[in-house]
Swiss-Prot record:
Protein's name according to its UniProt entry: Bifunctional protein PyrR
Function text: Regulates the transcription of the pyrimidine nucleotide (pyr) operon in response to exogenous pyrimidines. Also displays a weak uracil phosphoribosyltransferase activity which is not physiologically significant.
InterPro entries: PRibTrfase_dom (IPR000836), PRTase-like (IPR029057), PyrR (IPR023050), PyrR_bifunctional (IPR050137)
Catalytic activity, as annotated: UMP + diphosphate = 5-phospho-alpha-D-ribose 1-diphosphate + uracil
GO terms, biological process: regulation of DNA-templated transcription
UniProt family annotation: Belongs to the purine/pyrimidine phosphoribosyltransferase family. PyrR subfamily.
Keyword RNA-binding on entry: no
Residue interval(s) of motif PRPP-binding: 90-102
Keyword Transferase: yes
Superkingdom of origin: Bacteria
GO molecular function: uracil phosphoribosyltransferase activity
Positions annotated to bind substrate: T36, G37, R77, D94, D95, V96, L97, M98, S99, G100, R101, T102, V151
Length: 168
C-alpha cells in the first residue's frame, strides 16, 4: 500500500478547513494540536492557512482510559494553552484517528479548562477503525488497514508517513 504525501494532504485540508469554518461563521478559532504528531500537523496547517494564530498543545496521557493497559507514556509533558477555552471556537488537530480514545481524552482535558463554543476536529488520517462515535470534520485521507498494520507519522520536517507491520 502506498501512503499519501502529508504535505499534499495538509494543503487540501487547509482549503477544506477554511470552507468549513466560513460555512459555520467562525472567523477567529483557537488552534490546538495533540502531542506529538497533531502538533506537527497543526503547525503545518497554520502555515498553509497563512495564520499567525497561537497554537495550543495538549498532552492527553493522564486523560487516556487505556493507560492501565498500555502504561503511561514515558515522556509526559504539560499541556500549554495560551488562550482561554471558555466560549471559544476550537480547532482540535491530531495526526491519526484510530480508536477515537485520544480524541475523547483531549475533549475531557479541554472541558477541564472551560466550555468551548464549538470544537472542530481535524485529522491528517482517519483509519476507519473507531471504537467510539468520533469522526473528524476535516480529514486528509481515510485508509483501511489490516489488523496488524499501523501508520506512524514522523517529523516535524519533513512530515512523512510510514506503514508498520506489527506481525513482523
Amino acid at each position: 500500500m502506498s501512503l499519501p504525501n502529508p504535505a499534499e494532504l495538509i494543503s487540501q485540508m487547509a482549503i477544506r478547513l477554511k470552507a468549513h469554518l466560513e460555512h459555520r461563521g467562525i472567523s477567529d478559532p483557537r488552534y490546538i494540536g495533540i502531542r506529538t504528531g497533531g502538533v506537527w500537523v497543526a503547525q503545518a496547517l497554520l502555515e498553509a492557512l497563512g495564520s499567525q494564530s497561537p497554537l495550543g498543545t495538549l498532552d492527553v496521557s493522564f486523560y487516556r482510559d487505556d493507560f492501565s493497559q498500555n502504561g503511561l507514556h514515558p515522556q509526559v509533558r504539560p499541556s500549554a494553552l495560551p488562550f482561554e477555552i471558555e466560549g471559544q471556537h476550537l480547532v482540535l488537530i491530531d495526526d491519526v484517528l484510530m480508536s477515537g480514545r485520544t480524541i475523547r481524552a483531549a475533549m475531557n482535558e479541554l472541558f477541564d479548562y472551560g466550555r468551548p463554543a464549538s470544537v472542530t476536529l481535524v485529522c491528517l488520517l482517519d483509519l476507519d477503525a473507531a471504537e467510539l462515535p468520533i469522526r473528524p470534520n476535516v480529514v486528509g485521507a481515510t485508509l483501511t488497514l489490516a489488523a496488524h498494520e499501523r501508520v506512524k507519522l514522523s517529523g516535524p520536517s519533513p512530515l512523512q508517513l510510514e506503514l508498520q507491520d506489527l506481525a513482523l
